[in-house]
């Protein structure tokens, strides 16, 4: 099973070869732990959680069809993901909703504790900002990582990851805070000097009007120049969830 802990050899390669990496490649290396976490979330719930939900919440066939239209998944794949969602949502509180403690348990094997990195993952899934992740929000977020999701969807998602204050801009302090939190959770070692250099080069390249922050338009241009930033935002197995997680098909209790 994937552990979600990037190999420290990656950090060594970055520190010893930083001069040969482009700005985009360096910044991409910082992004890798976050996107790996989405992979860990799906695979860990699929393989390790063994609870059965008794929540009265159900998903009607009409809901499955609607979510299939709103995402890159087929109706059968949405149904399979509903089984995965139910496993995660009953791990602590069996109410058919994913609470932050349940997400933390899935990602870090510990239900409690404060972490900016976890907060950002949760906030990006929690579209309604009501403190829980509902199934349709779960589908919408995972759909961004589907191979058929558009480049613009992935670009927008990555922008929101670093726009901590939700001002419509990425500020240097936000990047510093977010990257530090990601590195802390991933055991990825980067020196302060190298991290500062990566952020300096990123803003020098992306902040075209030199106002100290990156707008959405500037971000779009930057990602277009450095497509490697989005390389890890695609999970190939989401193209066929029913094959990747066949047990969900046979365990489904979704009502037609």
Swiss-Prot record:
- Which InterPro entries does its entry note? CNBL1-10, EF-hand-dom_pair, EF_Hand_1_Ca_BS, EF_hand_dom
The induction field says: Not induced by abiotic stresses.
| Domain remark in the UniProt entry | The N-terminal 40 amino acids are necessary and sufficient for vacuolar and endosomal targeting.
| Site feature (Involved in dimerization) residues | 186
The protein here is known as Calcineurin B-like protein 10
* Pfam families reported for this sequence: EF-hand_5, EF-hand_7
Q: Report one GO cellular component.
A: endosome
Role description: Acts as a calcium sensor. CBL proteins interact with CIPK serine-threonine protein kinases. Binding of a CBL protein to the regulatory NAF domain of a CIPK protein lead to the activation of the kinase in a calcium-dependent manner. Mediates salt tolerance, but only when phosphorylated. Competes with CIPK23 for a direct binding to AKT1, negatively regulating its activity via a protein kinase-independent mechanism.
Domain (EF-hand) ranges: 77-112, 113-148, 150-185, 194-229
Which GO biological process annotations does it have?
calcium-mediated signaling; hyperosmotic salinity response; monoatomic ion homeostasis; regulation of potassium ion transport
Q: In which tissues is it expressed?
A: Expressed in shoots, leaves, stems, flowers and siliques. Barely detected in roots.
Q: Where in the cell is it found?
A: Vacuole membrane; Endosome; Cell membrane
Alphabetical UniProt keywords: Calcium, Cell membrane, Endosome, Membrane, Metal-binding, Phosphoprotein, Repeat, Vacuole
Give each disulfide bond as a residue pair: none
Q: Which GO terms describe its molecular function?
A: calcium ion binding; kinase binding
UniProt superkingdom = Eukaryota
Q: Which family is annotated?
A: Belongs to the calcineurin regulatory subunit family.
- Phosphoserine PTM sites in chain numbering: 247
Originating gene: CBL10
Q: What happens when the protein's gene is inactivated?
A: No visible phenotype when grown under normal conditions but hypersensitivity to salt stress.
């Amino acid at each position: 099973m994937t552990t979600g802990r990037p190999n420290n050899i990656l950090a060594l390669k970055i520190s010893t070869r930083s001069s040969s990496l482009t700005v985009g490649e360096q910044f991409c290396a910082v992004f890798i732990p976050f996107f790996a976490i989405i992979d860990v979330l799906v695979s860990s719930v699929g393989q390790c959680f063994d609870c059965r939900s008794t929540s009265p919440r159900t998903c009607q066939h009409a809901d499955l069809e609607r979510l299939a239209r709103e995402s890159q998944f087929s109706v059968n794949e949405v149904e399979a993901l509903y089984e995965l969602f139910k496993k995660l949502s009953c791990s602590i509180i069996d109410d058919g909703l994913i609470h932050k403690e349940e997400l933390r348990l899935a990602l870090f094997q510990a239900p409690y504790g404060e972490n900016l990195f976890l907060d950002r993952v949760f906030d990006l899934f929690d579209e309604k900002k009501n403190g829980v992740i509902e199934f349709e929000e779960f589908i919408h977020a995972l759909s961004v990582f589907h191979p058929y999701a558009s480049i613009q969807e992935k670009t927008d998602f990555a922008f929101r990851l670093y726009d901590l204050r939700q001002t419509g801009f990425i500020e240097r302090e936000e990047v510093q805070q977010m990257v530090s939190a990601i590195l802390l959770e991933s055991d990825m070692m980067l020196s302060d000097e190298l991290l500062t250099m990566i952020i300096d080069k990123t803003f020098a390249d992306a902040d075209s009007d030199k106002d100290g922050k990156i707008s959405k338009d500037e971000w779009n241009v930057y990602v277009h120049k450095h497509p490697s930033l989005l390389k890890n935002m695609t999970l190939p197995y989401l193209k066929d969830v029913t094959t990747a997680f066949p047990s969900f098909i046979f365990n489904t209790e979704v009502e037609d």
